[in-house]
Amino acid sequence: MAARTLGRGVGRLLGSLRGLSGQPARPPCGVSAPRRAASGPSGSAPAVAAAAAQPGSYPALSAQAAREPAAFWGPLARDTLVWDTPYHTVWDCDFSTGKIGWFLGGQLNVSVNCLDQHVRKSPESVALIWERDEPGTEVRITYRELLETTCRLANTLKRHGVHRGDRVAIYMPVSPLAVAAMLACARIGAVHTVIFAGFSAESLAGRINDAKCKVVITFNQGLRGGRVVELKKIVDEAVKHCPTVQHVLVAHRTDNKVHMGDLDVPLEQEMAKEDPVCAPESMGSEDMLFMLYTSGSTGMPKGIVHTQAGYLLYAALTHKLVFDHQPGDIFGCVADIGWITGHSYVVYGPLCNGATSVLFESTPVYPNAGRYWETVERLKINQFYGAPTAVRLLLKYGDAWVKKYDRSSLRTLGSVGEPINCEAWEWLHRVVGDSRCTLVDTWWQTETGGICIAPRPSEEGAEILPAMAMRPFFGIVPVLMDEKGSVVEGSNVSGALCISQAWPGMARTIYGDHQRFVDAYFKAYPGYYFTGDGAYRTEGGYYQITGRMDDVINISGHRLGTAEIEDAIADHPAVPESAVIGYPHDIKGEAAFAFIVVKDSAGDSDVVVQELKSMVATKIAKYAVPDEILVVKRLPKTRSGKVMRRLLRKIITSEAQELGDTTTLEDPSIIAEILSVYQKCKDKQAAAK
């Protein structure tokens, strides 16, 4: 009975979400406003209890999702997804061991949910609009065409020895063929790992080897911002060090010829030989769907594992409810498919919902700073989802590039990847959205699978505050923790952001190292999932994300462990020690700052600095190159030899007068020493301007 009642409640909520594109009144940043709607699970704010008494309301459904997960998620999974075999158990989870299981006993195929079900109903509906690098050259792909391409590619993979459970690396820019490659893997039960087509050969090889990939799929070249990217050359260098790779399937984005070696297979030629029909493999709910590598605070990037049913359900529901997506809408997420945002909100969420999804191959400023908005006008995009880094960049070009184009099709604007500052939020809302579009600042992670905290879903007319994620999605139960591991109660408080209950979209493990998964996410606060982020909870129960609490920095929305940069720097023979920290950056949100110690025998330190920048770009990616590299005689260390990065961060953020506890510092005089070097560097930069 509870499940049926809940299902009707969700239905009422889905109906009430229609028409939320009008922006409610907003206070300016930093100014509180009258609270008209509570948020979060029961207990997060006093207003929740009263609001939860209204059946079918956001607070009521949110409280029910927290109180009765099986009754909430069970009917949604049954009605949203196409099943081969029904599940017998909705959930079986234990945070103490990192055990996460949803919809156990059920079997389905993700590609059937994303393609076949829509082809049966409306085969000529547009699935993808490929916004290619050159504006005005977009290509539309119907669901029928995408299914046929997927099946041909799936059959090609099978012919080249890929079986259920095998891993396939996809090193491709945003394109219909890249989407088909993901879905082809899903169709035959293979596991894909999409690797951002900007990573170096060394980073690519590390991920291929960790995943033990049997096949790599790539293009001869890529096009981005008017430049040619030599993808095949990077793959050639990488696979020299990848013993598990048996074939490299090479498609062509340009007409330019590339070297084809013994491993290489011309993909289009092989696909043309294959049948456009491929029987889908029936997969268990908890079988691996994909792994995606994300940076940790230490060591090699982690292969985050997502599985079939729970991930797909969560991606589809968050896409529909957070963005108010309606049938016939054009959904424009401009993220790369090499990141989780591209997985969930370019591919799996929109396609499961039968949406038309835009694939954006270019950059925000090619050929000019109006590119996003010209694309919105030409494609008539209804929901636009992008990163604060791009917003901050475009803001500096002024309003004229925005106002030049018709943006009346837009109803929802979304921000993702990092906290958005007030200035960027206000500009996006006022200038881009004409003060009428709903702006959703979304918080989530690779590990969460989908959006966890956002202004929507909510009650109709509920307030939205600038630069604030605000309300937990259904089933997300946020908790703030203090340094002692105790729950922080009440309002206007800060703490480590944890989640106290499992949800379907969350990651299941780190590939090949479940203990690392447990240690990274469940050890710091036993019984809770630790996000690694800090948060602030307001009087109304809303959440504002305050940033990372570990040694992970967020550069233009790309998470990167400082240890990765330090490891790359350590390979230089003239640099015995380094410390990398993140610091605020006007455009990127955060940037990397490296302090290095150079050997006396090294010679010209300026040459060393340039060599280090080249090494980091080669070993990781260009975006990982530190904006500043400062040569110092020594690093501040504790008596036990630990580098005190906190003090270095204070120095470069002009907080050197408030260093806090330095009693464990081996030699306090080092602070003045580094400050002097840093000030000389700043003076030199100022003089150069």
From Swiss-Prot:
GO terms for cellular component: mitochondrial matrix; mitochondrion. This is Acetyl-coenzyme A synthetase 2-like, mitochondrial. Belongs to the ATP-dependent AMP-binding enzyme family. The lineage of its organism: Eukaryota, Metazoa, Chordata, Craniata, Vertebrata. Interacts with SIRT3. Residues 17-46 are annotated as: Disordered. It comes from the Eukaryota. GO terms for biological process: acetate biosynthetic process; acetyl-CoA biosynthetic process; acetyl-CoA biosynthetic process from acetate; ethanol catabolic process; propionate biosynthetic process. It catalyses: acetate + ATP + CoA = acetyl-CoA + AMP + diphosphate; propanoate + ATP + CoA = propanoyl-CoA + AMP + diphosphate. CoA binds at residues 224-227, 341, 556. Reversibly acetylated on Lys-642. The acetyl-CoA synthase activity is inhibited by acetylation and activated by deacetylation mediated by the deacetylase SIRT3.
